[in-house]
Amino acid sequence: MDDSILTLALGPNGTRALTTRAVERDAVLLVLEGSRVPEPERHSLQIGEALHLVSPDAPWRYLDHACEPNAWIELDATADVAGVRLRALVPLEAGVAVTFNYLTTEWELATPFPCGCGAASCAGWIRGARHLDAARLAALRPTLAPHVRARLRAEGRLG
């Protein structure tokens, strides 16, 4: 973790990642690292069709979900671990909790959960991209991971 950009802090719902300084839109906040496994786990991040990143002590595990996030996960087309980056969607001030929308990377969550983000566009129940309707998919399209886009195209749900 680049300590000049992110730090871990205890929040109301447990440990979370916070910015330590202001950053511009599209800044790389973190390069995600870990082991690759074929099946989703409770704290994994899907980086390919049957490829998930896991690490018991990685700082990215403390990124909270939000339906209106301030960051996104950028994956290169090969899902190379060096190509998994967390980028700012908007300019961020120092001390802001960093969030991303889990529905942009996860086809089917190993452990679905009710969302408590409170956003007007809240999905309500976070189960995975496969459960989203056309309107929600259209809104998320710019930040959907390549493997999610490919799966949706194969199902005829994304043009």
Question: Where do the model's predicted regions map?
Answer:
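Conserved catalytic SET/PR domain of SAM-dependent protein methyltransferases, capturing the structural core
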Residues: 1-159
